[in-house]
From Swiss-Prot:
Keywords: Ribonucleoprotein, Ribosomal protein. One of its GO terms (biological process) is translation. One of its GO terms (molecular function) is structural constituent of ribosome. It comes from Pseudoalteromonas translucida (strain TAC 125). Signal peptide: none annotated. This is Large ribosomal subunit protein bL36. GO terms for cellular component: ribonucleoprotein complex; ribosome. InterPro entries: Ribosomal_bL36 (IPR000473), Ribosomal_bL36_sp (IPR035977), Ribosomal_L36_bact (IPR047621). It comes from the Bacteria. Belongs to the bacterial ribosomal protein bL36 family. HAMAP family: Ribosomal_bL36.
Length: 44
């Protein structure tokens, strides 16, 4: 999974959709399940 500051380019891919889970914004892809992204997580 990629951690991106902006999901603009990720959500424009074919077959991808934006999902909110537990307050975080994810991009998941049905056509290519290996492609996933999350918007900027905090580093511990």
């Amino acid at each position: 999974m990629k951690v991106l500051s902006s999901l603009k380019s990720a959500k424009q891919r074919a077959g991808c959709q934006v999902v909110k889970r537990k307050g975080r914004v994810f991009v998941i892809c049905k056509e290519n399940p290996r492609f996933k992204a999350v918007q900027g997580m905090k580093k511990k």
